[in-house]
Amino acid sequence: GYDCSDVAKNLAETQNIEKVLIVDSEAYTNPIAENISAVLVSISEGYSHILAPATTVGKNIMPRLSALLDVQQISEIVDVIDSDTFDRPIYAGNAIATVKSNDSIKVITVRTTAFEPASKGSSSVDIFEIEPPEISNHLSEFVGSELTKLDRPELTSARVIISGGRGMQNGENFKLLEKVAELLGAAVGASRAAVDSGFVSNDYQVGQTGKIVAPELYIAVGISGAIQHLAGMKDSKVIVAINK
């Protein structure tokens, strides 16, 4: 990344971390897959596993990395059986596949909601600065980004989420959920049906093709419960469904 020394220091104080490698350059201000995958390839020698969260950024970078290393990526693991074997959901989360890799380097994305956050360690490990490789591929360039500003918590980090589906009937009714969310300090989500109906933008979408969440409390209002939606919120601690 760029100007990421504070992140490196925080990682260095995390439990079970042995060392931290940092590549700090203005070239990595924005997470362009071509640039970051080149860095990962340059430092991959000597490592058996390279992991990233199954976020938008991770899903963009890791497939390219696996192609450059000529290995098979293992996507969205939810459990580690041993150093070669992992569990990952299939069929929209209705089944769990156990996958064993014989590749010398395992390239893996992790479904973060399946694991507890790492704790702080009792000491800090060493941080090693890595010289960034020369960027010779200019096929992609950063054009711009637009930050969505919300007064409520972000979906993937919220402790309470209230989501609406097609049963809300229209966008005006959907705004009722926003008022409840303000009272609860909750984030607002939506099913794909609600997004496709134009009630809210796709930033709200929870499910297999949206955001994967695991809040303490998930309130579903007017949602039929399609398996694609369940795949995105089934790890919630408490689920309350309101259909009428």
Give the ranges of each region predicted by the language model.
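N-terminal glycine-rich FAD/FM-binding segment characteristic of electron-transfer flavoproteins
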Residues: G1-K244
